[in-house]
Structures are given as structure tokens and as C-alpha cells.
Amino acid sequence: MSTVPVKIKPLDHYEGLALPAYETPQSAGMDLRAAVPADEPVSIPPGEWRLIPVGIAIALPAGFEAQVRPRSGLAAKHGISCVNTPGTVDADYRGEIRVNLINHGQANFVVNRGDRIAQMIIAPVTQAVWEIADTLDETTRGTGGFGSTGTK
């Protein structure tokens, strides 16, 4: 496992919250906390989504991205996920990170200040250099997609 230094800027509305942290020594992701006002929890009715601020901005080194992903416990227990998963935070983005949560569950879900709402993974980036081709290598799969390899 490797590490990379990442600058983090807690924003004014992040005051009093713990910085994102790895919960175990082998964790790939660190939890992001909701930076909503304590007196204004955010309600997410079934089938709807809300953009939740996390109160931090980061400066990733060139060649890295941050991926924002759902927390498995919220998905399993409440049907809460991220609308665009994984969400990508590019190395040159300097604004506040926000999480677009969606409620796939049957009950209203309330996000309170400090709730752990998503996880963030720091990952290396590989950029493609396109090579125009008239043909592509043949494979066993060919053009089969969307279930073409079966379900069992």
C-alpha cells in the first residue's frame, strides 16, 4: 500500500467535524461527513436525491483523482447510494466536494450534520492516447455486450 500527500482545506461550515479518515489500517476509502447545518438536516424521500456538502476542498497531485462512492452500510440498510458512482474529483478541481445521494429505499432518509455519507478513494489516473484504427483485434467475445456472457 502506498501513500500520497494531499492538501485539504476545511471550509467554514466544516468546523467541529473530523477530517476524512481511514477507519481500519487496510481501508481503501475514507469516510466523508455531511457538513449540513446542525439545525437543518436534509430529508431525502424515497426515489429522490439531494446534493450534500461535505465542507472540504482538496488539491490532488497531478496524475491522481478522488473517487466518491457509496457506503455499503447505507446501501444495505437504507437503500442510500450516490447518483453518479463513482463520482470523480479531478486533480485540478478546487471547489467543495459534494455528494449527490439518492434514496432507493422505501422510507424517508434524514442526513444530519456529521453523518458519514460516502467514502472517498484516492487513485492514480491513466490517460488514453487514441490510435485511429480501421479494424480491431478479434476476440472470443467480439461485439457481444449487455448480458451476452450469461448470468450463471
Curated annotation (Swiss-Prot):
Cofactor(s) the protein requires to work: Mg(2+)
One MF annotation (Gene Ontology) recorded for this entry: dUTP diphosphatase activity
Protein name: Deoxyuridine 5'-triphosphate nucleotidohydrolase
Family: Belongs to the dUTPase family.
Taxonomic lineage of the native organism: Bacteria, Pseudomonadati, Pseudomonadota, Alphaproteobacteria, Maricaulales
Chain sites annotated for binding substrate: R71, S72, G73, N84, T88, V89, D90
Function according to Swiss-Prot or TrEMBL: This enzyme is involved in nucleotide metabolism: it produces dUMP, the immediate precursor of thymidine nucleotides and it decreases the intracellular concentration of dUTP so that uracil cannot be incorporated into DNA.
Known catalytic reactions: dUTP + H2O = dUMP + diphosphate + H(+)
Coiled coil: none
Keywords attached to this entry: Hydrolase, Magnesium, Metal-binding, Nucleotide metabolism
Source organism: Maricaulis maris (strain MCS10)
HAMAP family for the chain: dUTPase_bact
Pathway in which the depicted protein is active: Pyrimidine metabolism; dUMP biosynthesis; dUMP from dCTP (dUTP route): step 2/2
BP GO terms, sorted: dUMP biosynthetic process; dUTP catabolic process
EC annotation from Swiss-Prot or TrEMBL: 3.6.1.23
